[in-house]
Structure formats: structure tokens, C-alpha cells
From Swiss-Prot:
Every S5 DRBM domain range: 15-78
Organism: Helicobacter acinonychis (strain Sheeba)
Sorted UniProt keywords: Ribonucleoprotein, Ribosomal protein, RNA-binding, rRNA-binding
GO (cellular component) term, any one: small ribosomal subunit
PROSITE patterns registered for this protein in UniProt: RIBOSOMAL_S5, S5_DSRBD
Domain of life per record: Bacteria
Lineage: Bacteria, Pseudomonadati, Campylobacterota, Epsilonproteobacteria, Campylobacterales
SUPFAM superfamilies: dsRNA-binding domain-like, Ribosomal protein S5 domain 2-like
Pfam family name, one: Ribosomal_S5_C
Descriptive protein name: Small ribosomal subunit protein uS5
Described function: With S4 and S12 plays an important role in translational accuracy.
Self-association state and partner proteins as the record states: Part of the 30S ribosomal subunit. Contacts proteins S4 and S8.
InterPro entries: Ribosomal_Su5_D2-typ_SF (IPR020568), Ribosomal_uS5 (IPR000851), Ribosomal_uS5_bac-type (IPR005712), Ribosomal_uS5_C (IPR005324), Ribosomal_uS5_N (IPR013810), Ribosomal_uS5_N_CS (IPR018192), Ribsml_uS5_D2-typ_fold_subgr (IPR014721)
Entry remark concerning the domains of this protein: The N-terminal domain interacts with the head of the 30S subunit; the C-terminal domain interacts with the body and contacts protein S4. The interaction surface between S4 and S5 is involved in control of translational fidelity.
UniProt keyword annotation of Ribonucleoprotein present: yes
Length: 153
């Protein structure tokens, strides 16, 4: 299936998706408990295009499908210089701070938690990252995306 993003066509088949987090929300009602799920998904083509989305539904597969659809609406282009990023960058989103540093070739992706799938799906092969403050998956993913979007060649 193809979609239009700006002036370019996007082929969904060339994108990979990673489920970063699945959360369960409980609502207590007269008859017992009602469960709903939310899913945080990252999609990328390993060639500079990456996006994330949040989906909510009564069942996990439906939440993941909604999250993938949302991720394709929030695609960004990441500037990659060789196998790494062009310069150091630090960004804060709510209580989460993320620090991204370029690494020499052969270092690999040194990232933890929610940051690793983002940089891998963006196509960055060598990078050093540090997550500071809150490790809430949504906030860390959002901070990482904002930081990657601000990188200039």
C-alpha cells in the first residue's frame, strides 16, 4: 500500500515496525474491571525515514494497528552523515532528557530502552546515546524524535 507524504510516495512494505511498549489501562465499573490497551510503535525504512505512533483499543492487535497508522502520519527525515549523525544534540521532552553523540565507524548503536529501535530503524549504525531523567517510554521516544529532527547537516 502506498501513501503520499509531502511530494514523495511512501511504500509501506519497505518499512519495518517495532512495538516499543504495550500498556494496560483498567477502568473499574459496577460489573468488574474493563481493560483497554495502548501501544507505542516505531516504524522506519533504515534509510532516514522514521516515525512513531500511539494507538489505543480494547484489544492489543487493534491498538498496534492504530499505532502503526499513526506512525505513518508522523514520519520525519533524519539527516545521516556516513553511518552516524552530524553533531551532538541534547533534547528535553517533559521530564525526559536524551543525549545523542556521533560515534566513529565500527562503534555500533549504544542505546538503551526506547531509544535503540528508533536509531536502528532510522538507519544510524554508529551512535552513542544517554537517556536522563524520566524513562517513561512515550516521553523518551518523543524526546529522541525531536532531537533527531533538529539535526542539521
Amino acid at each position: 500500500m502506498t501513501e503520499r507524504k509531502g511530494m514523495e510516495e511512501i511504500n509501506r512494505e519497505e518499512f519495518q515496525e517495532v512495538v516499543v511498549n504495550v500498556g494496560r489501562v483498567t477502568k473499574v465499573v459496577k460489573g468488574g474491571r474493563r481493560f483497554r490497551f495502548n501501544a507505542l510503535v516505531v516504524v522506519g525504512n533504515k534509510n532516514g525515514l522514521v516515525g512513531f505512533g500511539l494507538g489505543k483499543a480494547k484489544e492489543v492487535p487493534d491498538a498496534i494497528k492504530k499505532a502503526v497508522d499513526d506512525a505513518f502520519k508522523n514520519l520525519i527525515h533524519v539527516t545521516i552523515k556516513g553511518t552516524t549523525i552530524a553533531h551532538d544534540i541534547e533534547h528535553k521532552y517533559n521530564a525526559s532528557r536524551i543525549l545523542l553523540k556521533p560515534a566513529s565507524e565500527g562503534t555500533g548503536v549504544i542505546a538503551g530502552g526506547s531509544t535503540r529501535p528508533i536509531v536502528e530503524l532510522a538507519g544510524i549504525k554508529d551512535i552513542l546515546t544517554k537517556s536522563l531523567g524520566s524513562n517513561n517510554p512515550y516521553n523518551v521516544v518523543h524526546a529522541t524524535f525531536d532531537a533527531l529532527a533538529k539535526i542539521k547537516a
